[in-house]
Amino acid sequence: ENKLEPLSDEFFDTSDENNYYVNGVSPYIDRVFRENEIDGEPWSDYAAGYMWGITGMVYNPEEVTEEEASTWSILENEKFYRQVTIKDNVRDAYFPTLAILNKDLLNSETFRNTSDYHEQLSAIMNDTRKETIDESEQKLKEIRQNVYSFETDSGKADMITGKVVANLQWSGDGVYTMDQAEDDDFYLDWAVPEECTNLWFDGWVMLKSGIGEDAAKKQAAEAFINFLSRPDSAVRNMYYIGYTSAIAGGDSPLIFEYADWTYGAEDDEEDTIE
């Protein structure tokens, strides 16, 4: 739509030690941003990774079994009438309907063992043909009759207070919800639907309407991205919001040390980190 300002060549200069983003971004995420294109241009020309994760279900294991939570069909499961929430945005409401409509294929071993599984899966879950959208709309209408709400933020509190027993959630908000519940001695769990889930990325971009021809503004915007990409900034950010940074840290050990501290085994548990 010609609304974004491309990142400068200077932003990608690895010889500049203040370019924390290019020197510290996860190699995997860097590759994803370079290989995926829109209108022939890679994401990396315009976007710098911020956070990333998946979507899944936060659920109350006293009310919902792991098997019941491990499928997108929980959204239409009448056993949980008005006890499950779904996201109130196009992408995260559309995606589950495609998984439900194609669940038999997605769960088949034959399909999963095909040599181009990921390519076929991507095609199915990014299908925007009119007939597919129409089928998705009908499925969403059915889901709407069963769920407690379409929400963006309220699902976290609804889970903690017990208004609902399962909540479609982004992974970082899932961590936040489970941590808050644990503070109240209330145990919640997390499940990834067996059909598939989506891998999402948040990224920083610059709007042409905001930058214009002002080189100082562009330099300031890129400096802001680099500030947030400093390993110490990334750790503080992850700690506060519960999400996973796109920054791996480069030569700095801070990111790994934080991940080990947060998710590593307790003293009386087996450490599985290699």
Predicted regions located by residue number:
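Small-molecule pocket liners
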Residues: G53-G56, F95, F201-W204
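Short loop->beta-strand "edge-of-pocket" segments that line small-molecule binding or catalytic clefts
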Residues: S73-R91
